[in-house]
Amino acid sequence: MPGPLVCDIASTELTDHEVARIRSPLLGMVILFTRNYKNPAQLKKLCDSIHAVKPDVLIGVDHEGGRVQRFREGFTEIPSMHTYGELWKADPEAAARSLTAAGYVMASELRACGVDFTFAPVLDLDWGKCEVIGERAFSLDPRVVTRLARALSQGML
């Protein structure tokens, strides 16, 4: 059973030091960033090498769409979650359908490369006061956030 710690890696290939760290019984997850990505084939090779070291370690990425999409070349560009919140105002059903489709695409592309999960959806409310959240949030309305997060999650299953 993997442990509670999360680590990152420095580049697009594992070093001997990183292999040793991944083998630690305390490590449960490796998080990837843009610096770990060149293209889908390289990402698949990296994820395969991580899982070869420790098959039960999780590989995650902050890949939400919009400006927080760590892998771009070879991946479908997913709009920001705020875009779907705006669509909700005009057509809630279309927003939910679009998000379910986006979730499917996002998860399918990540899984094809060996990534186990993404830190999406963001459930923060958009109070309009935090640039870090901004377009990452669906809406200020918690009911809208709940419905849209559910739609995205259903697509990711």
Q: Where are the regions that the model predicts?
A:
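Boundary/entry segment of secreted carbohydrate-active catalytic domains
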Residues: M1-T15
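N-proximal short alpha-helices
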Residues: G3, D16-V19, T118-P121
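N-terminal glycine-rich anion-binding loops that anchor highly charged ligand groups
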Residues: L14-I31
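Enzymes and membrane/adaptor proteins characterized by extended Gly/Ser/Thr/Asp/Glu-rich
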Residues: L26-L148
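Phosphate/pyrophosphate-binding betaalpha-module
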Residues: L148-L157
